[in-house]
Amino acid sequence: MAIVGGAALAIAGSLMQGCLGNPLVSPLTLGVASGAALGAALAIVLEFSIVSNSELAIVANAFLFSLIVVGVIIQLGNFRSVSAESYILVGIAITFIAGAIVSTMQYFATDAQLSQLAHWSFGCLL
């Protein structure tokens, strides 16, 4: 599973770099990873989830929120003709906004929730 996940991230990064013509573009700089972290934090701290199965709640939320970020970026391109630099700047803004929200949730989280959030954000496969 780890190999498939790593390969998917590599392909996603390569596609983003090719589409925007910038070798510095990645899921991190476009805010996709931060959107996923926000979704996971919502599932862990606020227990808000789009699915009722508690084992899939974190993953489903992370996936949904990363798709929301991708949708925002795609809509930016449909809105008007924008440069690759604008995509990157919007992605960086999304990264900081999502990071601020996650940090606020960490402040109000219990010790068990903090532990689970840290465990997930470090890349746990379980």
Residue map of PLM features:
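Alpha-helical transmembrane segments in inner-membrane proteins
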Residues: 1-126
